[in-house]
């Protein structure tokens, strides 16, 4: 699942959790790259030099395979398909999953997270669509788990405090 947290003046302005799946995007790109005998890194690099990124729509990656096969039949280059996949993953996440109307609504200060953002083509596609430079932390792929661990620790500590207070009574 995906979550979008909007910050305004150092406070959370809104939180949106998707109602649809957006998982498996990175896995799909990696599997497709391997099917063409590319590493995911080389596949992403190819996308960065695409002349005509293939329009693969904004469908879930589960249903995108047929669009990719059609693009291959029509003679699209590996670079154009790779770029098209990166754009499609971002468009799906922003417009179908998070359901924003305009990418500029994201603002100019964006931090991305998730393992799929380790893919430079996906990151660059996001930046082009959003019209801003995004910050990709070194721990982008584990930020969700890290955040969950922090929440769990806070909950655990509050339970210990509550238990300690109850024992003192």
Q: What residues fall within each predicted segment?
A:
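Active-site nucleophile and cofactor-binding loops and adjacent substrate-binding regions
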Residues: 1, 16-24, 84-87, 111-116, ...
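Conserved small/polar residues in nucleotide/adenosyl-binding loops
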Residues: 2-7, 162-167
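Solvent-exposed alpha-helices and their adjacent loops that cap or buttress functional pockets
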Residues: 6, 10, 61, 74, ...
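Glycine-rich phosphate-binding loop plus the immediately following alpha-helix
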Residues: 11-49, 150-154
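Glycine-rich phosphate-binding/hydrolytic loop that grips phosphoryl groups
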Residues: 26-31, 138-164
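Internal, active-site/partner-interface "lid" segment
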Residues: 39-67
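Adenine-nucleotide phosphate-binding core of ATP-dependent small-molecule kinases
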Residues: 66-95
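Glycine-rich phosphate-binding loops at beta-strand->alpha-helix junctions
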Residues: 88, 101-129, 140-144
């Amino acid at each position: 699942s995906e979550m979008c947290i909007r910050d305004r003046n150092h406070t959370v302005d809104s939180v949106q959790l998707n109602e649809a799946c957006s998982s498996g995007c990175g896995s799909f790109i990696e599997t497709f790259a391997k099917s063409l005998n590319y590493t995911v890194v080389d596949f992403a690099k190819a996308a960065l030099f695409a002349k005509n990124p293939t329009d693969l729509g904004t469908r879930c990656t589960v249903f995108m395979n047929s669009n990719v096969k059609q693009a291959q039949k029509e003679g699209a280059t590996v670079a154009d398909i790779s770029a098209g996949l990166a754009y499609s993953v971002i468009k799906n996440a922003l417009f179908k999953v998070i359901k924003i109307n305009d990418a500029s609504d994201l603002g100019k200060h964006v931090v991305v997270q998730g393992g799929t953002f380790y893919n430079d083509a996906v990151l660059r596609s996001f930046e082009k669509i959003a019209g801003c430079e995004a910050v990709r932390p070194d721990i982008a792929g584990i930020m969700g788990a890290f955040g969950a661990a922090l929440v769990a620790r806070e909950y655990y500590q509050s339970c210990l405090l509550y238990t300690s207070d109850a024992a003192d009574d």
